Amino acid sequence: MNDVKSCLLVGVGGQGAILISKIMSNGFMKAGYDVKQSEVHGMAQRGGSVSTQVRWGKKVYGPVFGKGEADIMVALEKMEAVRYAEFLNPNGVAVINDYAIKSTTIASGAEAYPEGCIEAMQKNFKTIAVPASDIAIELGNPKCMNVMLFGAMCDSLGCPEIDWEQVVAETVPAKVKELNLKAFRAGREAAKAAK
């Protein structure tokens, strides 16, 4: 518990990065860690980039970290993984939703969606890529993709003393608790299959 660990959550507005950061923060605080978190919303309401930083350890002095300092990056959209790759340390783990959201310029044909996002990450970092959006749709609600991806990254946190399933159950709204627990479990299984 002496070392401070850092996680960067990135995605597009509305994908649920902030809920993941709340789940993480709740779990770490219950386990006795000092936790700090920071959110950058940008143009989130217009489909813009969103990033959240979560840091935990015995004593954390600030919520923000710089380039090359994230131990884990969770990307809810694969192009966002590449966009924020410079924040991941060389020994870090990238957990990526194998899903593309096309911006207005890409949808209009003015730009092309970049090819090989996941492959680019795999060349430089330990990478766990899972089809979180597809699995969430199979579970009945695409909005649970974020919790599914959280399940996929859970083992990378290195905190086996935390009952993350219980933390998810206590953090998500009651009306979607069972769906999110299914998503969490599916994420853990998908990560095992992706390794």
Give the residues covered by each predicted segment.
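Active-site cofactor/cluster-binding pocket
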Residues: M1-K195
